[in-house]
Amino acid sequence: MIRITDTAQEHFAKLLANQEEGTQIRVFVINPGTPTAECGVSYCPPDAVEATDTELKFEKLSAYIDELSKPYLDDAEIDFVTDQLGSQLTLKAPNAKMRKVDDNAPLMERVEYVLQSQINPQLAGHGGRVTLMEITDDSLAILQFGGGCNGCSMVDVTLKEGIEKELLQKFPELKGVRDLTEHQRGEHSYY
């Protein structure tokens, strides 16, 4: 379910030592399963534990997860990273915006999951996104770019060298990827 690294557990243990006795942490997702999903960690005093919560016991603490957030925190990882710029807590939850789909789910669902959980987070750095419009009878994934990708001069490279390569590697049943977008360069374009 959730992995909390040893360094993150040490960090939380230090913080929890200054809290009311019995206080643990709560890991949650606000707006789970949507493009605006956000993950968080908060203190969870004993009186805030709900009967429907799931308790995950770790060596130095327990983490509580509410029933609604639980499926969206599959494969999540909390780490405490130190580099030249300082230290920071990181929470990676690849399934927060979209629940992980089963390996034998329909191809459309599996491709959509990869786009939302792996491709779109990379495109978001440039204000872009991609949407799966359909999978044709001849096994072509038809995509539409939006945001900063629409009109971007690099969209063909992104499509062929990035997205298409990744999708064809993950889904051998696909024959190719096509772009449905009419690219008109504008103020929103990244390049």
Swiss-Prot record:
Entry similarity comment: Belongs to the NfuA family.
Function: Involved in iron-sulfur cluster biogenesis. Binds a 4Fe-4S cluster, can transfer this cluster to apoproteins, and thereby intervenes in the maturation of Fe/S proteins. Could also act as a scaffold/chaperone for damaged Fe/S proteins.
Cofactor binding note: Binds 1 [4Fe-4S] cluster per subunit. The cluster is presumably bound at the interface of two monomers.
Name of this chain's protein: Fe/S biogenesis protein NfuA
Listed Gene3D superfamilies: Fe-S cluster assembly (FSCA), HesB-like domain
Residues that bind [4Fe-4S] cluster: C149, C152
Record's subunit section: Homodimer.
Cofactor: [4Fe-4S] cluster
Keywords assigned: 4Fe-4S, Iron, Iron-sulfur, Metal-binding
Any one GO molecular-function label of the UniProt entry: 4 iron, 4 sulfur cluster binding
NCBIfam families per record: PRK11190.1 (NF008392), YhgI_GntY (TIGR03341)
GO biological process: iron-sulfur cluster assembly; protein maturation
InterPro entries reported in the protein's UniProt record: Fe/S_biogenesis_protein_NfuA, FeS_biogenesis, FSCA_dom_sf, HesB-like_dom_sf, NIF_FeS_clus_asmbl_NifU_C
A Pfam short name: Fe-S_biosyn
HAMAP family (UniProt xref): Fe_S_biogen_NfuA (MF_01637)
